[in-house]
Amino acid sequence: MSTHVLRPWADVVKLHPDVETGVLTEAVFAIDLGAIAANDPNVPVVNRDPEAFFRATYLTADLRKLLEEVLACLKGKSGYNRVLKLRTPFGGGKSHTLASLFHAARKREALDGIPEAKDFARPGNVAVAVFDGEKFDARNGKTLDDGRTIQTMWGWIAWQIDPEKAFPLVAEHDKDRVAPGGDVIRDLLTKGASGHPVLILLDEVLKYMERAAAVGILDSTLQRQAKDFFQNLTVEVAGSEKAALVYSLTWSAREALGNVGLLAEIDKLASRVDQLREPVSGDEVLPILQRRLLGAAPDVPSATEVSAAYQEVVTGMQRAHAETASERRQADEEGRLLRDRMRAAYPFHPALIDIMRERWTAVDAFQRTRGALRFLASCMHSLKKNGGAKALLGPGEVPVKDVDVRVKMLKELGVQNDY
C-alpha cells in the first residue's frame, strides 16, 4: 500500500475571491430577484452582472434544459411548454434558476461563454417582468420614483412589460384592484409588448396570495382577484406565440407555513397548462458548489491522486474482510464508485455533502444549496486562513473550534439561540 503523503486541499485549490477574503454577506448567496431586476447597485456584482453571474454558475442538466426551452419559446418556436412551475426545496436553487432566466432573456450573449449553451435560441429584445410575492405589499402596492403607486401584481407586471403601452391596458383594473380577463391579458402579451417576446417570472406566489386574503374589495378579496388573474395568465401564456411564464411554489406543505389548502388551490389553477421543473438533483450540487466557492476549476491531477488513494485504502479494508470472490468483486466495484465520486466532489468529501443533503434537510431552517454554500464557504475560509486543511474537506475536518464556523453551522440548523 502506498505511503505517499497527500497535499492539503488548501495548498492546491484556488478559492473564489469572496471566500478567500471572508467577505461573505448574506446577499452574496441569497439572491434577491427583484433587486436584480431593478439593477440595484447594492446587489453583489456576481449576481447583478450577467457575465459574472454565468461565470459563477454551473448549468445543471435540468437548468440547461430549462434555459433552452424558455429561450426557444421566446423565439417563437413551437412544441414547448410555455408555463413552467419550479418546485424546489427551501434554498434548493429556485432563486438562482429564476435569476438565470432573467439574465439569459435580458442579455442572451452572456451565455456565449458556455459551450453547451452556444446553440440556444436568440429571441432578441425580450420584455421581462418580475413579480416578487415576498416583497410586493398586498395592501399598499408599490410606489414608483415619480410618486405613482402600482396596486396589484397585474399592474406591476404590465408596467415592467412597457409602462407606456402595456400598463394603460390594465390601468383601471389596477386602480380598482379587479383582475383583467383573458382578452386584456392577450393584448398585454402582444400589443403591450409591441410584438416583442415576453418573459414573466413569478417568485413566492403563495406568500403574496396569503397576504392578499386580508384585503377586501367589495364582495371579493384581493386574493380571489389575484387567483383569477394567475389562472387567466397561465392560459393566455400557454396559448401565446412568443411568451413564457415561470413561477415558483414551495416544495411541501411543511414549507407552506400551514396554508396547505391555498398551496393546493394555486397548484391546481395552472395544472392544465404547466409543467414541473426541478433545477437541481442528485450529485449536480457538487459542481454547483465548486463553481461558486472556487476561483478556478479543481486541479485534476490532485483530485485523481486523492480519490485513488482513498479508493486504495477503502477497497483494501473491504477485501480484507471479504470471504468470497463475489464479495471481493463487490469491494472492487464499490471502491471504483467511491473513487469516481470523490474525484467529482474534490476538494469536498462526498460524506460531508451527503450529511447536509440527507440529514440537515430534515431541519426546517436549513436552506439546502444556499445553506451549504454559506457553511462550506465559512469552513474553507477558516482552514485556508488558519491552517489545518487535510486532503479533503470532510465531516472530520470541519473547524468547529472556529467561533465563526460554529456560529454559522448553528445558524444554518436554526439552533443558534440554543447555545
Label each residue range with its predicted role.
Residues 197, 214-215, 244, 300-419:
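C-terminal helical "lid" subdomain and adjoining coupling/linker elements of P-loop NTPases
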Residues 84-89, 97-184, 279, 283-289:
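P-loop NTPase motor core
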Residues 46-47, 53, 105-118, 216, ...:
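Phosphate-handling catalytic cores of nucleic-acid transaction enzymes
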Residues 160, 184-194, 219-245, 267-276:
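Substrate-engagement module of ASCE P-loop NTPases
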Residues 131, 199-203, 228-232, 242-251:
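Structural recognition of the conserved hydrophobic beta-strand(s) that form the central parallel beta-sheet
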Residues 57, 138, 142-149, 213-224:
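Flexible beta-alpha connector loops of hexameric P-loop NTPases
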Residues 1-92, 99, 105, 265-275, ...:
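Walker A/P-loop-proximal flanking segment of P-loop NTPase domains
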Residues 193-223:
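Conserved P-loop NTPase "ATPase switch" module shared by AAA+ and STAND
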